[in-house]
C-alpha cells in the first residue's frame, strides 16, 4: 500500500504563462491510495479539492478517480488491461461530469495490438462557443464516446535506438448538440513512427518501478 498527499495552488495560470514566480496560496490538496496485492494487480483511488481553478468561472472543483490494472508478462510478451473512472464536481454546475476509460494491450514480439474505449461528459457550450462566464449560459452537457483499435510493429534497431511503426482508427459518437459540427459518427485515423533512445543498464520506468531491458536489448 502506498499513500500520496500533495498541497498546491489550485488556480490555473492566466495569459501571462511565464509569471510563475507568484504561485499563490497553497489552497488546494489531493490524495491518492495505491494497493498492489501481487505482481499482476494494481488498484488506486484518488480525490482532490481545487480552490477556484478557473479565473472566469466561479466556485471550486472536486475530482475523484478510481482505477484497476491487470498485467501478465513473460519474456517479450505481455497482456495489460486498465479501467479508469473519474468524476468532477463543480460548484457552479448543475450535475457531475463523468469519464470512463478502458484499455487493453497485447504484445507478442515484434507485434503489439491495442484497443481503447472512452466515454467523457463534455461541456458542449465550450465547443459550440455559446458558453458565457460567471456560471451562466452553459449548454446542456453531453457524452462523447470513442472506440480505438490499433497495431504496432517493432523494426530493426538502429544504433541502439528502438524503432516501431503503427497506426490506429477511432470511431466516435457525439451528442446531438454537436452533430451539426462533427457529424453523428466522426472517424479519425493516424499513422506514427516511434523512436526510443537506447536503454541504460538500469532499464526503463514501468508502472512506477524500474524495468530491466529485455534480452534483445542487453
In which residue ranges do the predicted regions lie?
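Outer-membrane beta-barrel "beta-signal"
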Residues: 149, 183-218
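Outer-membrane beta-barrel translocator domains and adjoining extracellular loop/strand segments
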Residues: 15-22, 50-61, 92-99, 125-132, ...
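Outer-membrane beta-barrel translocator/channel fold
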Residues: 47-56, 78-101, 112-147
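Residues on the lipid-exposed face of transmembrane beta-strands in outer-membrane beta-barrel proteins
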Residues: 1, 5, 31-35, 66-70, ...
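Transmembrane beta-strands of outer-membrane beta-barrel pores
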Residues: 7-13, 20, 47-53, 72, ...
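Residues that define the transmembrane beta-barrel architecture of outer-membrane proteins
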Residues: 25-29, 60-64, 77, 94-100, ...
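Loop-centered beta-sheet repeat module
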Residues: 2-54, 58
